Amino acid sequence: MTLKPIHVIGGGMAGSEAAWQIASAGVPVILHEMRGVRGTDAHQTDKLAELVCSNSFRSDDHTTNAVGVIHEEMRRANGLIITTAKDHQVPAGSALAVDREGFSEAITAKLEAHPLVTIVREEIAGLPPEDWDSVIVATGPLTSIALAEAVRAHTGETDLAFFDAIAPIVYFESIDMDKAWRQSRYDKAGPSGDTAAYINCPMTEEQYNAFLDALLAAPKTEFRDWEKDTPYFEGCLPIEVMAERGRETLRFGPMKPVGLTNPHNPTVKAHAIVQLRQDNALGTLWNMVGFQTKLKYAAQTDIFRMIPGLEKAEFARLGGIHRNTFLNSPKLLDRQLRMKSMPRLRFAGQVTGVEGYVESAAMGLLAGRFAAAERLGQRLEPPPPTTAMGALISHITGGHLAEKQTFQPMNVNFGLFPDITDYSKTDENGKRLRGKDKGRAKKIAQAIRALQDFDAWLAGEAVVAAE
C-alpha cells in the first residue's frame, strides 16, 4: 500500500527533525522550504537547519542539567539534529557547540539522500491546500508574513504574537518567604478563588532608588538589524525603558505598592512592591510580573537579586525581548500538537512557544512521530511529564497557568518537571545535604527518572508500532 505523504512546512530545526522522524517511520514526507526562492532577514544560506544566532546547543550534561537530559532523550529517539550536532562538535567545555556550516550542510545532505524525503523549494503563502490532510507547520520565529497572517486570521488576532517579551522566571524554592509573602492585590480572588495568587517582595524608598539607579546604569542587549523595525508596544515595554520615563514610573506601573499589606511588618507601608505570578501548574516556577527586559544576562542576575526576598534567587529563565512568531499554544493546540480547530495541522518548533534550538528540534521530533503514527493508523501518546520532552510539551499544551495574554516562550528546565522526593538527602557520610548540594542531588534524581521513563515510553512506542 502506498502511503499518502505528510507535508512539513519549514526546513529549520523543527521541520528538519520532523521530516527525518516521519521518513524513519517509513512514511513519505514532503519538506517545503522557502529559502532558495525567498530569503529571510536573518538567514544567510538556503541550507536546512541553518543556525541563525548562536552555534551552541547549550549543556550536554544529562546528569544534572535539563537541557542535557533532552539531548540524551533525542539521541535515544534517533534524533537527526542532536546526532548530527555531535558529529560536527567544536570545543566548548561542557556545552555542545557545532561548526555551523558543516552542521547545516550535513543535515541537508542526509535529508536529500533519504528515499522517502522530497524537498520542495517554495513558499507556502496562506494555509495549506485542503487536500493536504496531514501538515506540520514548523516555520520558526521568522514565519513568512503571508502564512502568519493566514494563521492569525484563523485563530484570532490575539492568539498569534510577533514579539516575545520575556520576564525572568524564578524557582520558588529560591525565594525567601521570610521577606516575601503571598497575597493578591486588594485580596481579590481570581478565577480559581485564590486571594493569594501572587508573591510580593517589598522595597523601602532607599532600596527602590538603589534598584532604579542600577537598572538605569546597566548594560543592555541591542536589537539585531532585522529586529529593529519591530516597535515596542505599550503593554510590553522593557522595564528599563519604563524607568527611563521617570523615577516614579515603575511605582505607578508593575511595582505599585497599593492594595497589599506585608504580614511580616504590617504597620509599615512599602514604597514599591515587585510581584511574582505562578507560571506553571506545579507551582515551582514564578515569573516577575512586568519585568520583561533587554538587560544583559549578568546584569539581570545582579540587579534582580537586589530585590528583598530574591537575594538568593535562582533563575529558570532570564528576561528578553525579540522578534518572534508564536501561538497561544495552551489555548490552540492539543497534546498531539494539533490545532484544535483544524486537526490536519500540527505545529512544531518555536512557533509553538518553546525557546531554543534544542527545544524546537524536540517538538519537531514529537510532531513527526505523532504524524507518522497517525498515518500508520496508530495513536502515539506524548512522553510522560517526568521526561524532558514530556515536561515541555505538557507546559505548552496545558501546564502554563497564567492568562492567555501572558503565555511566553519557555526553555526546558527542571522547574517544568513534577517534583521528586524519593532521593537521598544525605551524603556518603550520612550528613544531611543542604543548599546547592541538596539541589544537585534532586536534579540527579530527576534526570535519572526522566531517562528511565523515556526509555519506557520508547519501548511502549515500539509495542504500539508492532500491533
UniProtKB/Swiss-Prot annotation:
GO terms for cellular component: cytosol. Its EC number is 2.1.1.74. Its cofactor is FAD. Signal peptide: none annotated. It is an enzyme of class 2 (transferase). Keywords: Cytoplasm, FAD, Flavoprotein, Methyltransferase, NAD, NADP, Transferase, tRNA processing. One of its GO terms (molecular function) is flavin adenine dinucleotide binding. FAD binds at residues 10-15. InterPro entries: FAD/NAD-bd_sf (IPR036188), MnmG-rel (IPR002218), MnmG-rel_CS (IPR020595), MnmG_N (IPR040131), TrmFO (IPR004417). It comes from the Bacteria. One of its GO terms (biological process) is tRNA methylation. It is found in: Cytoplasm. Catalyzes the folate-dependent formation of 5-methyl-uridine at position 54 (M-5-U54) in all tRNAs. Belongs to the MnmG family. TrmFO subfamily. HAMAP family: TrmFO. This is Methylenetetrahydrofolate--tRNA-(uracil-5-)-methyltransferase TrmFO. It comes from Hyphomonas neptunium (strain ATCC 15444).
